[in-house]
């Protein structure tokens, strides 16, 4: 009897140990576990069901929220449409009009609200809402993101551009091209939106689907949800402009306010498992992108020799490392 109890206790301890070790990135625990083992369309659906439940904000709330989500190190608003602004949060908010770039900032739906008929909860979802220069925002209107070689309007220093789509993009029409340094940010915001709102309930209690949304960037279905030219462009944008520390910090701030996350920030390259070259590869929420070959284990210690990076490419700089997988001198190692 004692032997049986001892065996059960051992099994329970091993089970608990496995659960404690099976953790997602950025202390997300088992938040993404329901998506484990899935790929392609099935993965998109599973992730959407995970991130859809969240605290809905009011449109007025966003002014205060931006003070946590979009402030630079110098205390000014982080504007992704203009490179010349230095807005003070809560002071330089748009009060009605803007006559030129640099006047004030407003609440930008990076995915234009006309595409989803101004419905909630999309209308105030912080994962695609940003404070941007009001003048540049108004120039964009509800035009899709894209790339142009012949802009009819450019913000200061050519930072953002509006004009006809370039040849070979796969789309003919007017597009708004953000700065290269933020193209990945917007791509991941779009991946989030078409994943989160695959199916949802609007403020009237109606069951809706992203297939009802209307835009040239959208496919009017739940998968792939994005039109082919948009998928190809956004995958390229995300690869060329990988997840930054700004995005990681913003994701954490939105998590605190809204209580849901953008998985395409937590798992850099996740979009490839949904739409890209890895769409037939099973997603692993706690061993994402890790290979068993060539991975070394290290004790919990300060590693002084060589520069250490996280798998997302962030430099660690010699501080005590938390549990996880890191890269040093071109080799992976695990800290347990």
Predicted regions and their residues:
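Bacterial N-terminal signal peptides that target proteins for export
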Residues: 1-12
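C-terminal tail/sorting-segment detector
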Residues: 6, 325-336
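Hydrophobic h-region of N-terminal signal peptides that target proteins for export
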Residues: 12-22
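N-terminal module-boundary/linker segments of secreted carbohydrate-active enzymes
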Residues: 22-87, 273-281, 314
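Short cysteine-rich loop/turn motifs with clustered Cys
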Residues: 76-97, 103-104, 133
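Domain-level detector of nuclease and nuclease-like folds
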Residues: 95-106, 110-291
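Residue-level detector of functionally pivotal "anchor" positions at catalytic/ligand-binding pockets or at interdomain
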Residues: 279, 284-312
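C-terminal trimerization/auto-chaperone modules of long, extracellular attachment fibers and adhesins
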Residues: 316-318
